[in-house]
Design a protein with these regions (language model features):
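Bacterial N-terminal signal peptides
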Residues: 9-19
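Small beta-barrel nucleic-acid-binding modules, primarily SNase/OB-fold domains
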Residues: 21-163
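Bacterial N-terminal signal peptides that target proteins for export
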Residues: 1-10
Length: 163
């Protein structure tokens, strides 16, 4: 009788776990940086997890020929991404795009550099309210140093200025 209860419990746990919708998808390929700071990997648009990239003025990198122009965060991402990018998909958005934690310069022995953290520590992104604590700490450090968007006026779409 005891053996039967253990097997029944095991089967129940397996059924519950298999019915949960878990995003374990990982994409790894060359990434194209879109004007809004999203990435295009394998024909999928990926928003970087935990951050909002505010609109900034258009700048041009004239050290390249032809000059590369775009939002400051997009230019920073293009500078950082020199090879393949690996993204761990966290969720799918209603428009079909994905949200994920993306890493550049990764290897078998190193997970690489978190692109959301990279933008936050340079001041080109804002941590969302539900972002990890580390992201909020990086945002505060960039803000205290007056880096990136903290030197110019921006809109924070999730904060009501009339409160």
């Amino acid at each position: 009788m005891k053996h039967y209860k253990v097997n029944f419990s095991l089967v129940t746990i397996i059924l519950l776990l298999s019915s949960m919708h878990v995003f374990a998808e990982s994409l790894s390929s060359y990434a194209f940086v879109n004007d809004d700071g999203t990435l295009s990997i394998k024909n999928k648009t990926i928003h970087l997890y935990g951050i909002h990239i505010p609109a900034t003025s258009i700048n041009c990198r004239t050290s390249q020929q032809p000059p590369v122009c775009g939002e400051r965060a997009a230019l920073a991402l293009e500078f950082k991404i020199q090879s393949f990018v690996r993204c761990e998909v966290m969720s799918e958005n209603p428009d079909g795009s994905l949200t994920g934690r993306c890493f550049a310069n990764y290897s078998n022995f190193d997970e690489g550099e978190d692109l959301s953290a990279y933008l936050l520590e340079r001041g080109w992104a804002i941590a969302l309210p539900d972002a990890p604590f580390e992201y909020h700490a990086l945002e505060r450090i960039a803000q205290s140093r007056g880096m990136g968007v903290w030197g110019i006026a921006i809109d924070r779409p999730y904060i009501n200025p009339f409160r």
